[in-house]
């Protein structure tokens, strides 16, 4: 005998929003880049795009506003490129305690595994793609995913069940 599974009030709304979220998250590389996110290049940025967008050993970071606070509307990609116009609300959506941008910050930098000596260099991936700005483009798209996810979650009715 199967256990009793209560039905959710507003099930069709949950199903519809769930489909939209699944499509959004599975196809995150195809969503439009968030329109307000812009690139600012420093005055000494190289003309060569491979050098301008090069990812180094230093992690990307949100600039500090003081001792503890960070400016989540800006992301220092490297010494030459800063992304601006990121809605602070994009930090409101998190996966395992981190926003998608925080996952990018943590994963996309050159690092060497201490045990094996293997170098993980995201620039190799960029060269394979033939797009030096692929990570910048990904960041813009992840802002769209974060913002749209939050918009969809707000539309869900309170979770209630009935028999």
Region locations from a protein language model:
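Sequence-level detector for compositionally biased, low-complexity segments
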Residues: 1-163
């Amino acid at each position: 005998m199967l256990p009793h599974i209560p039905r959710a009030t507003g099930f069709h709304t949950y199903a519809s929003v769930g489909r939209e979220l699944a499509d959004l998250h599975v196809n995150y590389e195809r969503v439009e880049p968030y329109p307000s996110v812009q690139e600012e290049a420093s005055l000494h940025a190289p003309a060569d795009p491979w050098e301008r967008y090069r990812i180094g050993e230093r992690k990307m970071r949100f600039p500090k506003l003081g001792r503890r606070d960070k400016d989540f509307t800006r992301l220092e990609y490297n010494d030459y490129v800063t992304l601006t116009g990121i809605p602070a609300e994009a930090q409101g959506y998190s996966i395992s305690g981190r926003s998608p941008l925080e996952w990018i910050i943590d994963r996309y930098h050159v690092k060497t595994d201490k045990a094996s000596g293997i170098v993980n260099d995201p620039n190799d991936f960029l060269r394979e793609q033939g797009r030096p700005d692929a990570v910048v483009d990904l960041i813009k798209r992840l802002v769209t995913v974060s913002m749209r996810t939050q918009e969809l979650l707000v539309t869900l009715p309170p979770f209630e069940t009935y028999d």
